[in-house]
Amino acid sequence: MAMNLLNTASIAKEMQTKVTERMGDWFEAEFKAKANSASRRTRLIRSHGHTYTYARYQNTGQLSSNLKQVKKGDKIVVNAGTRANYTSGYHGMYFLVEKKGMQDVKTTLKKGANYANSMKL
């Protein structure tokens, strides 16, 4: 009687790497899109009877080009670089201190969980 022996450990390892790679790609693309939209977000200032607009965090546009996937062991981390990677003196992720930026991260993480559950391999 021949039994079909499946190497479940190697199958699980292969599935884990595929899911990790796909999730890393998805999060990188999603955060790049959010960073680009944040760089276009402007502020309105009303002063002396005039309305002025300016982009509060101008180097968040550089954030999308600085986002990279870094493989650490079995995991993939989406890294945004350090302050030295940006032209201004602050990091490109500072747009997250605003309410809209925090909402962007919450919705992205929620969408990420839904994407992982609906993923077909």
From Swiss-Prot:
One record GO biological process: viral tail assembly
Quaternary structure annotation from Swiss-Prot or TrEMBL: Homohexamer. Interacts with the tail tube protein.
Keyword rRNA-binding assigned: no
Coiled-coil zones: none
Family, per entry: Belongs to the Skunalikevirus tail terminator protein family.
Localization annotation: Virion
GO CC annotation, single: virus tail
Alphabetized UniProt keyword annotations: Viral release from host cell, Viral tail assembly, Viral tail protein, Virion
Function field: Plays an essential role in tail assembly by capping the rapidly polymerizing tail once it has reached its requisite length and serving as the interaction surface for the connector and the tail tube proteins.
Name of the protein described by the UniProt record: Probable tail terminator protein
Predominant location: virion
